[in-house]
């Protein structure tokens, strides 16, 4: 399997990974996966329930197993959970099996996008903006180091972000091995 056969989206919660991922999969004729949705489908419960019963560590173990499995597939677009990059094993799977796309948004922007979403356990706090700032501080350097492509989501529509991504991915196609979802 070529590194360019898969696209993996990383970024904080609310960055648009699932929405953009679906559009990329449609555009390139790939199968779309969302690691959080896969975990929910396999367990039969929502992410907050897993956090409540198993804690974040239990959820991260499940996430690691799902990412290890999905990254063996070819011709996929995968939206990862915001904290997936905290695992060295996940970073290695993503780095070696596909192109990593970082959707970077400011904590303020992401707080606005997620303010009514109760399916995000880490934001169920008295100050979600402070939590997003903390997560950004912790994870942004990891996302940047891992990413083959970074797109700033500030003041961009989903259509605008995907246009930027198509252009950047087309440029990458000209380098070494090209992205070819057909394998």
UniProtKB/Swiss-Prot annotation:
Pathway given in the UniProt record: Metabolic intermediate biosynthesis; chorismate biosynthesis; chorismate from D-erythrose 4-phosphate and phosphoenolpyruvate: step 5/7
The yes or no answer to whether the keyword Calcium is present is no
Known PROSITE patterns for this protein? SHIKIMATE_KINASE
Q: Which residues bind ATP?
A: 14-19, 120, 156
Name the major location: cytoplasm
Any GO CC annotation of this UniProt entry: cytosol
Q: Where in the cell is it found?
A: Cytoplasm
Source domain of life is: Bacteria
Q: Which GO terms describe its molecular function?
A: ATP binding; magnesium ion binding; shikimate kinase activity
What function does the entry list?
A: Catalyzes the specific phosphorylation of the 3-hydroxyl group of shikimic acid using ATP as a cosubstrate.
Family statement drawn from the similarity comment of this UniProt entry: Belongs to the shikimate kinase family.
Which protein are we looking at? Shikimate kinase
- Please give the organism: Thiobacillus denitrificans (strain ATCC 25259 / T1)
Q: Which lineage do the record's taxonomy fields give for this organism?
A: Bacteria, Pseudomonadati, Pseudomonadota, Betaproteobacteria, Nitrosomonadales
Gene symbol? aroK
């Amino acid at each position: 399997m070529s590194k360019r056969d898969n696209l993996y989206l990383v970024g904080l919660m609310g960055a648009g990974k699932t929405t953009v991922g679906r559009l990329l999969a449609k555009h390139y004729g790939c199968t779309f996966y969302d690691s959080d949705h896969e975990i929910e489908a396999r367990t039969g419960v929502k992410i907050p329930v897993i956090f409540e019963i198993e804690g974040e560590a239990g959820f991260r173990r499940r996430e690691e197993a799902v990412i290890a499995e999905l990254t063996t597939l070819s011709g996929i677009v995968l939206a990862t959970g915001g904290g997936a990059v905290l695992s060295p094993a996940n970073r290695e799977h993503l780095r070696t099996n596909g192109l990593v796309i970082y959707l970077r948004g400011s904590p303020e922007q992401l707080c606005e996008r997620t303010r009514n979403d109760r399916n995000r356990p880490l934001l169920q706090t008295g100050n979600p903006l402070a939590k997003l700032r903390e997560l950004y501080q912790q994870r942004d350097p990891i996302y940047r180091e891992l990413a083959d492509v970074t797109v700033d989501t500030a003041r961009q529509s989903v259509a605008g972000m995907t246009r930027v991504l198509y252009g950047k991915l087309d440029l990458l196609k000209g380098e070494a091995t090209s992205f070819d979802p057909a394998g």
